[in-house]
């Protein structure tokens, strides 16, 4: 189940809010310009599935979102727990960074933890199958897929290099706990 925890950015041990209520998650994130929606991931795909398999399964959803929002590029992040590069892939986005365009992800299998740093608050969003999240450009954040990553997310971009992270150099991400999935997805 999706989960949101909000913290003061100096108190990682004490959440100000901890909820699994989708309506509350969406409302709280909307306050900071983040879109959170529950969609239906209707075609079964397993973590580690190829981009071609995921595109074939979700072509109608992809085409609709591209048409609605003007995306120019789409790819798939699909990582299974047995991926030999999982530690390297996990480390890639564990430090605070931002993108120069909106970061839009639709989780069609598994889970991962987006952590946003906005003002003096930290928002941990556990995204699971059926979650669509859109993080506005310039929002500082990090992403943790866990020790044994298991997820498939369709990623949407307005520019081909939109996925490139611009790192802030702060150590705030190390002050917050690493991701341990709360459910099997």
Swiss-Prot record:
The record marks 102 as: May play a role in transmitting local conformational changes. InterPro entries: ARD, ARD_bac, RmlC-like_jellyroll, RmlC_Cupin_sf. The record marks 96 as: May play a role in metal incorporation in vivo. Pfam families: ARD (PF03079). Pathway: Amino-acid biosynthesis; L-methionine biosynthesis via salvage pathway; L-methionine from S-methyl-5-thio-alpha-D-ribose 1-phosphate: step 5/6. Binds 1 Fe(2+) cation per monomer. Binds 1 nickel ion per monomer. It is an enzyme of class 1 (oxidoreductase). One of its GO terms (biological process) is L-methionine salvage from methylthioadenosine. The record marks 105 as: Important to generate the dianion. GO terms for molecular function: acireductone dioxygenase (Ni2+-requiring) activity; acireductone dioxygenase [iron(II)-requiring] activity; iron ion binding; nickel cation binding. Its EC number is 1.13.11.54, 1.13.11.53. Keywords: Amino-acid biosynthesis, Dioxygenase, Iron, Metal-binding, Methionine biosynthesis, Nickel, Oxidoreductase. Ni(2+) binds at residues 97, 99, 103, 141. Fe(2+) binds at residues 97, 99, 103, 141. Its cofactor is Fe(2+); Ni(2+). It comes from the Bacteria. It catalyses: 1,2-dihydroxy-5-(methylsulfanyl)pent-1-en-3-one + O2 = 3-(methylsulfanyl)propanoate + CO + formate + 2 H(+); 1,2-dihydroxy-5-(methylsulfanyl)pent-1-en-3-one + O2 = 4-methylsulfanyl-2-oxobutanoate + formate + 2 H(+). The keyword Magnesium does not apply. Monomer. Belongs to the acireductone dioxygenase (ARD) family. PANTHER family: ACIREDUCTONE DIOXYGENASE. Catalyzes 2 different reactions between oxygen and the acireductone 1,2-dihydroxy-3-keto-5-methylthiopentene (DHK-MTPene) depending upon the metal bound in the active site. Fe-containing acireductone dioxygenase (Fe-ARD) produces formate and 2-keto-4-methylthiobutyrate (KMTB), the alpha-ketoacid precursor of methionine in the methionine recycle pathway. Ni-containing acireductone dioxygenase (Ni-ARD) produces methylthiopropionate, carbon monoxide and formate, and does not lie on the methionine recycle pathway. This is Acireductone dioxygenase. It comes from Stenotrophomonas maltophilia (strain K279a). The lineage of its organism: Bacteria, Pseudomonadati, Pseudomonadota, Gammaproteobacteria, Lysobacterales. The gene is mtnD.
């Amino acid at each position: 189940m999706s989960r949101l925890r909000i913290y003061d950015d100096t108190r990682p041990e004490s959440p100000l809010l901890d909820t699994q209520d989708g309506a509350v998650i969406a409302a709280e994130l909307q306050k900071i310009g983040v879109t959170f929606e529950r969609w239906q991931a209707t075609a079964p795909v397993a973590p580690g599935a190829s981009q071609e398999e995921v595109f074939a399964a979700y072509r109608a959803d992809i085409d609709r979102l591209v048409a609605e929002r003007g995306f120019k590029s789409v790819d798939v992040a699909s990582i299974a727990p047995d991926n030999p590069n999982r530690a390297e892939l996990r480390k890639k986005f564990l430090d605070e960074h931002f993108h120069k365009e909106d970061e839009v992800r639709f989780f069609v299998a598994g889970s991962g933890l987006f952590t946003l740093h906005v003002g003096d608050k930290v928002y941990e969003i556990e995204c699971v199958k059926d979650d669509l999240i859109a993080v506005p450009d310039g929002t500082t954040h990090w992403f943790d897929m866990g020790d044994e990553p298991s997820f498939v997310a369709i990623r949407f971009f307005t520019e081909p290099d939109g996925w490139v992270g611009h790192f802030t150099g702060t150590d705030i991400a190390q002050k917050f706990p690493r991701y341990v999935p709360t459910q099997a997805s």
